[in-house]
């Protein structure tokens, strides 16, 4: 799996960017750009289980691999949820799981720089 990397600088303090991106309402707002109605169920605490879901309830089953407040969060995606059933062991899922979604937040002049990477590690 190829690692994809995206970067953006946001004119806001790092703590505000973090809180907005990971808070329930802020998460719904920014993910609406690619999946209207997306939300999560669970906690951002290290080791916690978290589900990323569409309005129909389909989505991903994941866990928080790392969480350093206002600096870095790593999501380990373990499988899919389809029609209420968690799948972490099918051939389809084993082809890509685990996959990681990492967010790095850093201070820059005038705001916060966010680097997002998606891949196997």
What feature does the model see in each segment?
Residues 6-8, 61-66, 98-107:
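Hydrophobic/aromatic beta-strand elements that line small-molecule binding cavities or substrate pockets
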Residues 1-39:
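Hydrophobic ligand-binding cavity/cleft-lining segments
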Residues 38-89:
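Glycine-rich portal/gate segments that line the openings of hydrophobic small-molecule binding cavities
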Residues 2, 56-58, 97, 110:
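Short acidic/polar mixed-charge low-complexity motifs
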Residues 77, 84-121:
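Beta-strand/loop substructures that line and gate deep hydrophobic ligand-binding cavities in soluble
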Residues 17-21, 27, 50, 64, ...:
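Hydrophobic pocket/interface hotspot
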Residues 1-3, 70-72, 109-113:
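A generic structural signal for beta-strand entry/edge sites
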Residues 29-33, 51-56, 90-97:
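Short, solvent-exposed secondary-structure boundary motifs
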